């Protein structure tokens, strides 16, 4: 029987994961099935159990189930433990379930694709929700100095408390945003509504790279704003999406897919939709 993989979410029809993993499987000559599964909001656990019983080998998890998936794991990676959420599940040969969080790893991989060196650079991370929390440890491990700004200062300070043992991380109030950063990452959902975070424009300089975790057919509102302010480059989150999927695929199959072609194909598909 063919090994089965899936992405669980609600809603899930928008997911690009089946397309991405299909491309990865073809590229690496892996024989597998990958599907999108709409789990009832109150029935994720039973849905997952059924999947494991029917030759499920691994699963991706998206909203609103990442925290619930975390609680269903027998083992957790360091990234998952600190993120408090899981986006990748693997059924181990002993029957136990391992949880990983590859979101931040995908972000760092995409940053490395676009910048020659991350070591020592100062990054302003906007937002302190799940997307931000899943990114802090990989950013610190990459040698970045992380500064977190959130509308609610206490949330930013909570992340600092969690991640201080792992590197140089600080919370900044809006009054402390007074100079440009090397990298500005928008982990908020502001671009979904065509808005930009309420931050002073001085944080973006002529050598700043700006990164929006959102992606769309057109340039995101955050990236348009950043380029208008003179940012040297603005990148959306499509590469992060493909990057986190590549890390999941590697965990499951033991092979590392090449991401550049997949990003290009996905970009073309999104523009044609």
From Swiss-Prot:
Keyword Amino-acid biosynthesis recorded: yes
Enzyme type, top EC level: oxidoreductase
Enzymatic reactions: shikimate + NADP(+) = 3-dehydroshikimate + NADPH + H(+)
Gene Ontology terms: biological process: amino acid biosynthetic process; aromatic amino acid family biosynthetic process; chorismate biosynthetic process; shikimate metabolic process
Pathway noted in the entry: Metabolic intermediate biosynthesis; chorismate biosynthesis; chorismate from D-erythrose 4-phosphate and phosphoenolpyruvate: step 4/7
Enzyme Commission code: 1.1.1.25
Residues that bind NADP(+): 78, 127-131, 150-155, 213, 237
Annotated residues for binding of shikimate: 15-17, 62, 87, 103, 215
A Gene Ontology term for the protein's cellular component: cytosol
Active-site residues (renumbered): 66
Entry keyword set: Amino-acid biosynthesis, Aromatic amino acid biosynthesis, NADP, Oxidoreductase
Gene3D superfamilies: Leucine Dehydrogenase, chain A, domain 1 (3.40.50.10860), NAD(P)-binding Rossmann-like Domain (3.40.50.720)
One protein family per Pfam: Shikimate_DH
One term of GO molecular function: NADP binding
Cross-referenced NCBIfam families: aroE, PRK00258.1-2
Function: Involved in the biosynthesis of the chorismate, which leads to the biosynthesis of aromatic amino acids. Catalyzes the reversible NADPH linked reduction of 3-dehydroshikimate (DHSA) to yield shikimate (SA).
Quaternary data: Homodimer.
Family, per entry: Belongs to the shikimate dehydrogenase family.
Protein name, entry field: Shikimate dehydrogenase (NADP(+))
Originating species: Shewanella woodyi (strain ATCC 51908 / MS32)
Gene from which this protein is expressed: aroE
